[in-house]
């Protein structure tokens, strides 16, 4: 999308895009080229040793730039969420794998009634140019496990392209950013935490088809085995918390857990596909370019 860029500043509510990054100086121009005009961009730098911050300031002069307080994607997102002031928060990656041009579709899903707009590479026309056979198999298994335990209908649990209303941050309840000591939730498991906790709260989740591209420059920090095990451990923690119905402390040994909310999850898909959950509400949303530009 090198021509017309959608201007979301002309609409309400206000939109903040949070972008965690570390050593992504070469990729940021591609991200900026496809970024719609939004009310606020929050750049979270993870101690980059290249020109990431300099390039970000040049591309987005008005961006809020913060340094994350620990390591890991989860901590970076928590720092970005804390700095965000928009009504809607959109989380994307800085490596070019998530397409900023899709942001209007996520925002539209929220303004049409969703609490969480969940990107999906495996339904509603979504696709991935990057996922390996091992990651696809692991994602499918983790999807099935979460859907059975929490009575949800996720098609793509581990994809990090999401948008949600900022008012739901207390439900997500990520670890505090005030300490430098490592916390459970600081890593790639953050995406599972967000999805499961919002589902457990009985909020409306709409899946939006998304195209994942290959990283443009550099190498991914994702490790399919170790990060997959962290996600599996997160699912078990949330399952135990659901049974106990109580909140634990934020620490590596005892993760922060939300209180249990007795409500059925509503997982809706924008294309009207079956979710596999009998009580789930299916919402159809028009995500054509003309519609999302309105």
Predicted regions, residues:
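Acceptor/aglycone-binding surface of glycosyltransferases and processive sugar-polymer synthases
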Residues: 69-71, 75-83, 101-184, 215-222, ...
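Short aromatic/hydrophobic "clamp" motif used to bind/position activated sugar donors
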Residues: 89
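N-proximal low-complexity "stem/linker" segments adjacent to membrane-targeting elements
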Residues: 1-33
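Hydrophobic helical membrane-anchoring modules
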Residues: 1-12, 178-294
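Conserved donor nucleotide-binding strand/loop of the catalytic core
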Residues: 42, 53-83
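Short beta-strand/loop segment that forms part of the nucleotide-sugar
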Residues: 32, 38-48, 66-67
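Acidic helix N-cap motif at the loop->helix transition within catalytic regions
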Residues: 26-30, 50-58
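A conserved acidic beta->alpha catalytic loop
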Residues: 45-54, 96
């Amino acid at each position: 999308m090198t021509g017309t860029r959608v201007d979301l500043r002309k609409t309400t509510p206000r939109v903040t895009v949070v972008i965690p990054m570390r050593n992504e100086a070469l990729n940021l121009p591609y991200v900026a080229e496809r970024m719609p005009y939004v009310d606020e961009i929050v750049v979270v730098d993870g101690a980059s040793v290249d020109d990431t911050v300099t390039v970000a300031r040049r591309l987005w002069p008005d961006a809020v730039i913060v340094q994350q307080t620990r390591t890991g994607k989860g901590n970076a997102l928590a720092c970005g969420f804390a700095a965000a002031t928009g009504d809607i928060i959109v989380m994307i990656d800085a490596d070019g794998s998530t397409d900023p041009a899709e942001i209007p579709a996520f925002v539209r899903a929220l303004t049409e009634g969703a609490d969480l707009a969940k990107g999906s590479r495996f339904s509603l026309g979504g696709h991935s140019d990057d996922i390996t056979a091992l990651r696809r198999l692991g994602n499918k298994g983790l999807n099935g496990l979460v859907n059975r335990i929490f009575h949800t209908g996720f098609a793509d649990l581990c994809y990090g392209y999401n948008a949600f209303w900022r008012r739901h941050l207390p439900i997500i309840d990520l670890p505090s950013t005030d300490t430098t000591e490592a916390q459970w939730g600081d890593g790639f498991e953050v995406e599972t935490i967000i999805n499961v906790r919002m589902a457990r709260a009985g909020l409306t989740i709409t899946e939006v088809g998304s195209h994942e591209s290959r990283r443009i420059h550099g190498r991914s920090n994702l490790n399919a085995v170790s990060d997959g095990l962290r996600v599996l451990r997160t699912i078990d923690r949330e399952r135990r918390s659901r049974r106990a119905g109580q909140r634990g402390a934020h620490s590596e040994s005892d993760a922060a857990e939300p209180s249990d909310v007795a409500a059925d999850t509503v997982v809706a898909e924008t294309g009207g596909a079956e979710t596999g959950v009998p009580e789930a509400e299916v919402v159809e949303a028009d995500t054509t370019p003309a519609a999302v530009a309105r």
